Amino acid sequence: MKALLDISAARVFVDGIFSRPRIAHPEGVAIHPDGSIWCGTEVGDLIRIDADGKSHSLVGTTAGFLLGLAFDKAGNCFVCDLKHAAIFRYDAATKRMERFAAAGIQVPNYPVIDEERGFLYVSDSSGDPGVGIYRYDLKTGAGGVWCPGPTRFANGMAMAPDRKGLYFVESHVPCVSYVPFEADGAAGEIRRAVSDVENVPDGLAFAPDGTLYICCYEPSRIYRFRTGGKLELLIEDRKATTMAHPTNIALKGTRMYTSNLGRWHITEIDLSALNGR
């Protein structure tokens, strides 16, 4: 499968190998409402990167291992911590990082915020097969299993464009699956949405037009999937250098940002190079 974009469309947006704070093997990445790019590191640091990539700063730490992260409309950041088996919340008003929820979950991987329903959904990567997705009240942090699976390494997630369900990666299948919201808010039946995502899909992101992007831990590649269409290879770094095991992606206009678990930087990809393709 030929890639739509050459690797030259990607560049190192910010290099944190020797910086303070150090961008140590970032796994999660997200766009703040103010346009800045945030990422988490293997030592539990939550880092804010200026929109132009010229500087970055430490905003909080769990002293753990941060995975996926997401923002609510107020700019509060919810982040999954592998070491502590918990979800932490960085409060935009108080500037404090505090444990938000942990009930039942073993390997919290990726959070999706649903302010309309008042819940936080978090994938659990434990077990094969294992429990798929937990749900926590956004106000209290109380919650438990929402989608019991079985799933095979539930990983990155994204809210469906119509907000009627969640898309999530099953890395060990490998595929992208979909679970709808029932009328009462319960999880519906899981179905396969995108198959043959080789070899280890990890993160997801929807573009405003409904295009689904799927990044892979291995090999270092990103796919594009359009409803009713076929799976296409967007970009691949066969040397795993500019893109080195991109575990999560975030979109801002015509730019895509990837975390790189294999290195110490955030990558920026120019999607305008697609030229309408």
Q: How would you name each of these model-derived features?
A:
Residues 175, 195-230:
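Loop/turn-rich, solvent-exposed surfaces of beta-rich toroidal or solenoidal domains
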Residues 45-47, 86-88, 131-134, 175-177, ...:
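A short loop-to-beta-strand structural motif that recurs across blades of beta-propeller domains
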Residues 11, 57-61, 98-102, 144-148, ...:
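Beta-propeller fold detector
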Residues 18-34, 62-77, 81, 103-130, ...:
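Beta-rich, blade/repeat-based domains predominating
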Residues 38-57:
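Beta-propeller domains
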Residues 49-54, 91-95, 137-141, 180-185, ...:
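Short loop/turn segments that connect beta-strands within beta-propeller blades
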Residues 41-42, 82, 125-127, 171-172, ...:
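Short loop/turn segments immediately following the C-termini of beta-strands
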Residues 1-23:
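A short helix->beta-strand "capping" segment at the edge of beta-propeller domains
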